[in-house]
Curated annotation (Swiss-Prot):
InterPro entries from the UniProt entry: Urease_gamma, Urease_gamma/gamma-beta_su, Urease_gamma_sf, Urease_subunit
Keyword terms of this UniProt record: Cytoplasm, Hydrolase
The gene coding this protein: ureA
Lineage per the UniProt record: Bacteria, Bacillati, Actinomycetota, Actinomycetes, Mycobacteriales
Family of this protein: Belongs to the urease gamma subunit family.
Gene Ontology CC annotation, any one: cytoplasm
Name by which UniProt lists this protein: Urease subunit gamma
């Protein structure tokens, strides 16, 4: 299987998010990279599903709460920006204060 660098990056994000979800389901608090992976994966998959940028900007804030992450992680992530592929092209999705 040959993957472009872009496809490799998406695969890495997807796997990191899946690993973080498994850890979260075991009751572990997520660290910074795990939180970013889950939020990023949510945005990429939402775009793939045909959701709008506005919808993702709102739903991206509902993926994780303070109870899901280690102390200090919400303050380390003031925003998440992802270039996602939508049915009508690539767009930048920005989620401000993604962990409420």
């Amino acid at each position: 299987m040959r993957l472009t660098p872009h496809e490799q990056e998406r695969l890495l994000i997807s796997y990191a998010a899946e690993l973080a979800r498994r850890r979260r389901s075991r009751g572990l608090l997520l660290n910074h990279p795990e939180a970013i992976a889950i939020i990023t994966d949510h945005l990429l998959e939402g775009a793939r599903d045909g959701r709008t940028v506005a919808e993702l900007m709102v739903s991206g804030r509902e993926v994780l709460g303070r109870d899901d992450v280690m102390d200090g992680v919400p303050e380390m992530i003031p925003d998440v920006q992802v270039e996602a592929t939508f049915p009508d092209g690539t767009k930048l999705v920005t989620v401000h204060h993604p962990i409420g």
